């Protein structure tokens, strides 16, 4: 997922450079309907938000942009589930109970799957991925700000390869 932070052109460049047989480009962090429209214009295949508003949901529906909406509480999870979102971003994961919270949510809400972000690291990613209701994880460890600022694409590529090797069935 590529950050929108003032960079519709950046997403467009990534979409044009991507080999669609190897992956898709998502856009985040969507915070407004304008962000949704910018992501769609840039060619993003999906959007990601840390939380959700009716404005974001309506804009995504209007432009047919699939959304990974954020939720942090059982009420937010239930609200999104009632609107058809069975896969949700759990953010910020660590400060909202992390693995223990996701285990607790599984009992009463087994039909919801999550992508936890916020406090997920290369060290604890496999712990999250071992959970039945976690389909993937996200974390800034893949592209740390210092590596981006230094244009250290080789280091970021190495981190991305390591992250892509993580799975529910690996010991990476």
Region annotations inferred by a language model:
Residues 50-56, 89-99, 133-155:
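Glycine-rich phosphate-binding active-site loops on the catalytic face of alpha/beta enzymes
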Residues 32-42, 75-83, 100, 120-136:
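Catalytic cores of alpha/beta
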Residues 7, 28-32, 52, 72, ...:
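Active-site beta-loop-alpha junctions enriched in small/polar residues
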Residues 17-23, 109-111, 170-172:
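Short helix-capping segments at alpha-helix termini
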Residues 1-6, 10-11:
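Single conserved hydrophobic/aromatic residue that forms the stacking wall/gate
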Residues 60-62, 146-172:
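C-terminal helical cap(s) of enzyme catalytic domains, especially alpha/beta-barrels
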Residues 25-28, 47-48, 67-70, 88-90, ...:
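Hydrophobic faces of well-ordered beta-strands that scaffold small-molecule active sites
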Residues 12-73:
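Glycine/small-residue-rich loop that forms an oxyanion/phosphate-binding "nest" at active or ligand-binding sites
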